[in-house]
């Protein structure tokens, strides 16, 4: 929905062009893409900002359109994207290559990384407005370059090679951290403009106060009223419309864990304001400052915050009297004495202990609660006394949960249940109001923002499906088509959530069923980067260049493009450009004979192709039509346990072996077989597993094969392989493991180039 235009008489061609643009922009507003979206401005106001020289932002525009459509598809299917925030452009490219459809870019990693002008630090959005867009520009540039490199290499392939080589989608589907917008409406617009100019299609804006912004999992968060958050969202949409980009706006709320707000002006926030119900208690501010001053007077000069304020003597006297009666001054004296005697306690430590006791005492003595809770207490008391009440307490709570302070007070007076209540008494020294944070407040904030955003995000203090469901159901009760996002934060200790491994594995899937389409590990890349660096640095110190050799072996195993780094970064395409620009006269190609990359093309391990050749012989003998393909990969990413899979032409897995190569104390290589399967009955008892084991023994130079928790099939197979001469001995130890010793002379015979012995093994002539 947008504000309707009034008819304007058109005279000149200039005005006619302007009105055409206004009409086109209005049609754009009215398109299905923006169904349910409210704009607080007109198409005319947008066009007035554009000027006459067209400026195109094709990367952001095309990415935004395609990304939004994909998110809508996922929402309809109740599925989701699970992603993380990369710490480098290489990580972003790898994510897309590994099939993660979208990328998150957070201010946490930007803060932790620092820049040429900013020190690394915590996530307080204290960096310049341009810093996250600058980080985003590097990611987008890396993705576009990866796309160009891929396109060039695919052009050099035959049609058959292209069909066998997957093409990766490097479009910059990114949702980036716009923090609080970094100020007022002009700052929000400037920030969004910078994101669009570098090609970013999505942005999240939160409802924290600029200047006091915290990471979503730090304390001390101060919210802004709902109307202020809506202004930010509207300003972002306004800038996107000016730039003709259907960007994806995510409205984040921190209301679940916040306890402060900088204004009581918005009616939607008022049900959650906390106030004193005992009005003879000195204000929270005066008591807090009097406590600080007491520390100062007792010689702790570092605690001097009271000097910022000009509290009157009478206020200090009233607050001091209350602190004395509550025993807080006594606690201050005890803490200061202990600090002097101990010498080891920090000033922050002794202050925090006393402050916690003060807060609990003040809240208790002031009867701190929301106005709705105060009225409910009056109604419940009247009900318990048998007095007639005009509304049941539960009915009142339902009403008060959405009522403004004005409406709630009017209703309470009508019921004869208007208790004393004052939120001004509970204000902090900085002037912030105290609020009742929690999921109900986060729901209220998100419902207010929903018509102005494409996706809603409630920041949470832990990972909890029940909390997510409560939020999703409340939002979808009023906005059934509203897409949601969820922070799978590394700030959570996932092993303290009470979830099993399987529940953690399925957590993103369960979120998708609730309508959470974009679920992300905010600074996952930062932790990946750190742990990988620690592991490699340790290995380098312990094992010298063997550490790098092991890394290169792993790259070959998983067929990582990092195995050929010059190609990865675009060496062949660069040489092609050099040839084009020099009329093919250049003799300085980077990928020529002098490139050490050719060393990485040398086959240092037994190739999978050898087993595929054996399987072709085997298939021919048994007249099987499928052309079999061999895949060797870690069973799970990062695992030392490997899986060798045999696949048919339709990519169905026909057989597999789960195993781990290990070395014993004497340096002998042992294959530890955990599981093996032949999935098609028609493939069994044809020595398929024998061929697979022969190749594994050859590939890993194994001296023995151990079968863990073996089955009867394992017993039969190993005895048959012994009869074929592949094993010299087969022993079963205590029923839990089969130990088979490899017969290397027989292995050598089976590996001879003429393949006579191998063919006899396949055809069962031997």
Curated annotation (Swiss-Prot):
Any one biological process term the GO annotation gives: tricarboxylic acid cycle
Enzyme Commission number: 4.1.3.1
Transmembrane portions of the chain: none
Reported consequences of knocking out the gene: Deletion of icl2 has a little effect on replication in media containing glycerol, glucose, short-chain fatty acids or long-chain fatty acids. Cells lacking icl2 have no discernible impact on the kinetics of M.tuberculosis growth and persistence. However deletion of both icl1 and icl2 eliminates growth on fatty acids but has little effect on use of carbohydrates. Cells lacking both genes are incapable of growth in mice and are rapidly eliminated from the lungs and spleen.
Activity regulation (record text): Inhibited by itaconate, itaconic anhydride, bromopyruvate and 3-nitropropionate (3-NP), when M.tuberculosis grows on fatty acids, but not on glucose. Succinate at 5 mM inhibits the activity to approximately 50%.
Cofactor(s) the protein requires to work: Mg(2+)
Alphabetized CDD domains for the sequence: ICL_PEPM
Binding, Mg(2+): 177
Keywords: Glyoxylate bypass, Lyase, Magnesium, Metal-binding, Tricarboxylic acid cycle
A Pfam entry, by short name: ICL
Active site, renumbered: 215
Expression induction or repression: Induced by palmitate, acetate and glucose. Repressed by succinate.
Function, as annotated: Involved in the persistence and virulence of M.tuberculosis. Catalyzes the reversible formation of succinate and glyoxylate from isocitrate, a key step of the glyoxylate cycle, which operates as an anaplerotic route for replenishing the tricarboxylic acid cycle during growth on fatty acid substrates.
Name of protein: Isocitrate lyase 2
Record organism: Mycobacterium tuberculosis (strain CDC 1551 / Oshkosh)
